[in-house]
Amino acid sequence: MVQPYKHEPFTDFTVDANRQAFLAALEKVEAELGREYPLIIGGERVMTEDKITSVNPANKAEVIGRVAKANKELAERAMKTADEAFRTWSRTSPEARADILFRAAAIVRRRKHEFSAWLVKEAGKPWREADADTAEAIDFMEYYGRQMLKLKDGIPVESRPGETNRFFYIPLGVGVVISPWNFPFAIMAGTTVAALVTGNTVLLKPASATPVVAYKFAEVLEEAGLPAGVLNYIPGSGAEVGDYLVEHPRTRFISFTGSRDVGIRIYERAAKVQPGQIWLKRVIAEMGGKDAIVVDKEADLELAAQSIVASAFGFSGQKCSACSRAIIVEDVYDQVLNRVVELTKQLNVGDPAEQATFMGPVIDQGAYNKIMEYIEIGKQEGRLMTGGEGDDSKGFFIQPTVFADVDPNARIMQEEIFGPVVAFAKARDFDHALEIANNTQYGLTGAVISRNRANLEKARHEFHVGNLYFNRGCTGAIVGYQPFGGFNMSGTDSKAGGPDYLILHMQAKTVSEMF
């Protein structure tokens, strides 16, 4: 009997035993740094001369691992393997597939701190952020396993006398999962197991900045009983391997999480029907945001300030849900702005391996350079209140940065920065604040801080985002509780961790029998 779903609790690091366990996990991971990792194709380990070098963003001299790098030939081999494995895996019972997810979740739960320690080292996540990432990975496995069991017999439809009608779901085929570096365990695992539990086979191309944790997860799935060839681990260049697989005539669907520009490129390339292709490919995409917290004059101003700071600067603002715009009605603008600046100045920036660190590095040199360029733009477009400095001598550290008095159409109010930068804009009233909030090509998350029920109800209908929060920050969606995905250029509104997500990986079949 499968127990009802509940999300994995976060670790309380005020408990000394938990602290000691996490420190021990960090020591274990540090002892394994610098190893080489192969591709996994059909269960076989394939080493390549060309490697992807994963480094610690807090200490770029520290190599996390050197990972084999797939090319087109190896990608083709993986595709043939996955295509062949689909014949048997697609006929494996939903119960058996779900059981593999439950076993994998149990394995990760037993090694929870170890996986979180890999996230500290490879992604630069502070303890709490790493712990939440691992918990979310467990949640995806537990939730999607249960969702597949709910869907396994289809959905009831009507039948007339002398007729029996059945409506049920079957797998699609080979899926290409292109996962991001910012949630390198949770989103990588979630998108992978959603495709697997629905009976598809997977080619997993993890982000080049964080391939080691993906390899560790592939090992977990093997240990949990996933047959060889059902998941093939093939990190590689997006321009070479990514494009090749997106365009491949045997690819049935692509599950992508990443930037708007790459998402658009994938969508365009997947739309073209290749010679020999006998279906229209499906694209499941989550492509970022320009998320806003709106504060009205009747808000709890301390809650507003704390929500903005936590949402803007958690994991250095490297979340597609991060608050990069704070839209405050003019009556309370100065109070909220000044309190946010006070709180921001208190934040601890440093090595994520230290428990006291609130904010670690950004992911790599490219991200560092881009964010620092946006900070220079911000100095022209707004008033720098705090932050603005960076140091990439050892790692990629940027101070949390607040700009005030920014025009709603300014670049730092319109373009996704993906770093620890928040821009403040002043609104005349609540209606104007919503107008500013919706003035973006994205529509992922948003929050409203208000005690005014009429304003909250107005926002419920008019604030055009996929995930809207009242009287809390705009990050931290929980699997099964707040299904996650956005509108417009934030993607295909595929609600990860929601009741209709698995259906995106299947196709419906109707069978009607007369008797």
UniProtKB/Swiss-Prot annotation:
> InterPro entries in the record, alphabetically?
Ald_DH/histidinol_DH, Ald_DH_C, Ald_DH_CS_CYS, Ald_DH_CS_GLU, Ald_DH_N, Aldehyde_DH_dom, Proline_metab_enzyme, RocA
**Which transformation does this protein catalyse, written as a reaction?**
L-glutamate 5-semialdehyde + NAD(+) + H2O = L-glutamate + NADH + 2 H(+)
Listed CDD domains: ALDH_PutA-P5CDH-RocA (cd07124)
Chain segments annotated as transmembrane: none
Keywords attached to this entry: NAD, Oxidoreductase
What residues form the catalytic site here? 286, 320
Under which pathway is this protein filed?
Answer: Amino-acid degradation; L-proline degradation into L-glutamate; L-glutamate from L-proline: step 2/2
HAMAP family, per the entry: RocA
Listed name of the protein: 1-pyrroline-5-carboxylate dehydrogenase
Q: Which organism is it from?
A: Geobacillus thermodenitrificans (strain NG80-2)
Gene of this entry? rocA
